[in-house]
Amino acid sequence: PYGAGVNLSKNATLLLDKLGLKDELISLGYLPERVNFRSFNNARLIKSVSLNEKSNDFISIDRRDLIDVMKEHYLSLNGELKFDHNCSYIKDTEIYFHNKQKTTSDLVIACDGIKSDIRTKYFDNLIPKFSNLVAWRGMTPRSELSSNSLWDQINIYLGPHGHIVHYPISKGNKINFVAIRKQKNWEDESWVSEGNMQELLSVFSLWNEDVLELFSKSDNLHKWGLYERKSIKKLVNGNLLLMGDAAHPMLPFLAQGSCLAIEDAYSFSELLKINTNLNKTLTNYQKLRLKRGNKIQVKSRIQGYMNHLSNRYLIFLRNAFLRIFGKSLQVSIHKYNAIKEIKHLPN
């Protein structure tokens, strides 16, 4: 309901293209040419990494557009959506809902996000933990901003105890931003609340004028507490299977949450086509996806630590590292090819 941008890198768009969705998503989103790492206070360029050089593999898009496209294609395949069906508990093949309804299924796929009740009840008996980080998320109409080519690309500003990301969505007509900062506690019962513009401008008052302009002209602002869970030890328990943030919720520092959820779903469907034996499919899914999800989850935490350095010597080393290895770090994540990984999986 709040609207937020999402970045889809090659590891996801490769699969969306295979499903026939990529061109439609491109028509609704934006194809940024570069991602720029900058200093927080003066916007000085640290490293620029090219995107979409040879093909349209990196799409920035409004999350609502992504969901709508997927939903419409799902319904066109005679898929069914049921609302007001919160899962109460599962017993063997029977699924019970809070509305007193019941259904049966040989398999239950839980993709109910970081707050996943199914994960807590049937996998690790743990609840998400506040990460001591908060995020302000908002959108600003491009027409409200100064004439600046900055808005046409992805820009990441690295500062002490926080960072800011902004990028174009909706054919370049909106600029989506995320501003992340350390915060000791999160006392709001909900994980998201309406954002206070004065608080946001005060917290980032020492940052550069471009981001302050972006904030001040936003017509949509919400504040989120960022939560995390420990890496999971298994993705399958009997006839229960975890996908997406229910399986590997990650802090948003590598922009891979949605991408890995797409990898999960595509991988499982292809594995099931190859081998209709459900137990074998579940075994292969865990073999294929557990390590990948946990690895990116850990990398995201490390990236957050690197983004928020405050010691000037460590900042110098980080910036030097980015200048040398920035491109290869990006490629190492985006080059993952779920189609090839499935083919190479031992029988």
Model-derived features with residue positions:
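Histidine-centered metal-chelating micro-motifs
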Residues: 115-116, 135, 162-165, 247-248
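Conserved N-terminal helical subregion
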Residues: 9-141, 184-201, 344-347
